[in-house]
């Protein structure tokens, strides 16, 4: 039960220590048989890669669940934590449907504990009527406890762990397996129920909490962004091996070098992980392919490869390169031109967009509309289009048309609100708008 907690280097050291202490003992190799076949089938069904590291973590989670009713999946975002439990749950459910002995179907119930108040999570007395009102967790526990079906109920806590809410779970996590509420209710954890905590780290978790749970650490660096890209290529170019290979070469040529340069030589006001940056790159390229209707392989013919690489470079600039500050943009552009002269030599790649018909980079200046204020406009309604507003609007609009979430980041007074408001005004009637102001004091109610 110790190996799942270690990073790769520590795992190697641990095995060497075991070899020194028990020189004549060989660790048995676990075989999972039908479960491994089911896991591989679910990965293929979900268009995911059968990565050795991911499968290892899935089986470690499975082994940990056999011995503990409470387990923690720990690791950075986009590292495969959710994928691990989802694939295992689906595989077990599939085996149960086939009638395979020893496996039950799984019903996962996901809770975000930090998104609600403590009273909303566990329950509280109404101060006006002094009546008890169950919270989200107590309601779920009662429903699962009363359910006599053999189906496994996994109660998943997705979010940061801290003493504010986790300490009340200690009696459930230990051998007592009882949730005790402040009104005196004691809800037992049945044999078909188990707890799973999915969190980034355990910095503020007490030793008492950590010691009560099985631990599986999933290192996002071990999985790497290449795994995601391969799955994206399989989904996007499923029936076109030639185009898939072309785009795979784009990633090989550009992405790794650019990511390393960004980490070593550029400053990011809001640091974004390599994995998230590559996910954004794939999303933006997908969105550009949908928005730019003239970007079609059959219509472009022999120019397709050239246009596709320019489009890929544009998406790379506004995904991986979008997080660097103004002072680092020239450095970032120099990195691009060092890799290939396809990148614009004058100004920076941030100053150009792609004209698919001309197969060339065109300055954003050419796309800035001529604007004159209307007599009826008030001063606060006037938004003078510039290169910045034009290119930011284009990228934002491209994402929105493809229903991809957008996050605008910048200092106060840089035009984020104006950009968002102007985009909302131009949305078609198929969209509805809701403006919500958030602050540190905002609650779930």
What are these regions (language model features)?
Residues 1-445:
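Conformational switch/transducer regions in large eukaryotic molecular machines and scaffolds
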């Amino acid at each position: 039960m110790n190996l799942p907690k270690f990073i790769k280097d520590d795992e190697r050291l641990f095995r060497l220590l075991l070899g020194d202490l028990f020189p004549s003992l060989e660790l048995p190799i676990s075989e999972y048989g039908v479960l491994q076949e089911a896991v591989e089938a679910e990965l293929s069904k979900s268009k995911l890669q059968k990565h050795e590291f991911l499968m290892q973590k899935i089986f470690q989670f499975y082994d940990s669940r056999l011995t503990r009713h409470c387990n923690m999946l720990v690791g950075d975002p986009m590292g495969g934590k959710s994928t691990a439990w989802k694939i295992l749950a689906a595989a077990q459910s599939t085996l149960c449907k086939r009638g395979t002995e020893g496996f039950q179907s799984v019903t996962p119930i996901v809770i975000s504990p930090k998104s609600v108040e403590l009273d909303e999570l566990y329950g509280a007395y109404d101060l006006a009527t002094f009546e008890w009102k169950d919270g989200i967790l107590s309601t779920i526990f009662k429903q699962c406890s009363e359910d006599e079906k053999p189906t496994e109920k996994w109660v998943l806590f997705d979010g940061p762990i801290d003493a504010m809410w986790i300490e009340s779970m200690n009696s459930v996590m230990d051998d007592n397996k009882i949730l005790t509420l402040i009104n005196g209710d004691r809800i037992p954890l049945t044999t078909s129920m188990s707890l799973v905590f999915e969190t980034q780290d355990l910095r503020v978790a007490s030793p008492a909490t950590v010691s009560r749970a099985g631990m599986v650490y999933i290192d996002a660096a071990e999985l790497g962004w290449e795994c995601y890209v391969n799955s994206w290529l399989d989904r996007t170019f499923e029936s076109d091996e030639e185009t898939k290979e072309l785009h795979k070469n784009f990633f090989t040529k550009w992405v790794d070098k650019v990511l390393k340069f960004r980490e070593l030589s550029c400053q990011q006001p809001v640091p974004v992980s390599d994995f998230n940056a590559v996910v954004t790159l794939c999303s933006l390229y997908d969105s550009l392919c949908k928005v730019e209707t003239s970007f079609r392989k059959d219509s472009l013919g022999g120019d397709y490869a050239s246009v596709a690489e320019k489009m890929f470079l544009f998406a790379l600039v506004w995904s991986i390169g979008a997080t660097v500050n103004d002072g680092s943009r020239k450095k970032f552009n120099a990195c691009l031109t060092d890799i290939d002269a396809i990148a614009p030599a004058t100004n920076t790649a941030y100053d150009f967009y792609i004209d698919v018909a001309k197969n060339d980079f065109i300055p954003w200046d050419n796309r800035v509309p001529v604007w004159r204020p209307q007599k009826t406009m008030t001063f606060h309604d006037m938004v003078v289009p510039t290169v910045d507003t034009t290119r930011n609007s284009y990228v934002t609009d491209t994402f929105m048309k493809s229903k991809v979430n957008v996050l605008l980041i910048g200092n106060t007074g840089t035009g984020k609100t104006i950009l968002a408001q102007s985009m909302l005004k131009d949305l078609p009637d198929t969209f509805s708008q809701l403006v919500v102001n958030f602050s540190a004091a905002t609650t779930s109610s």
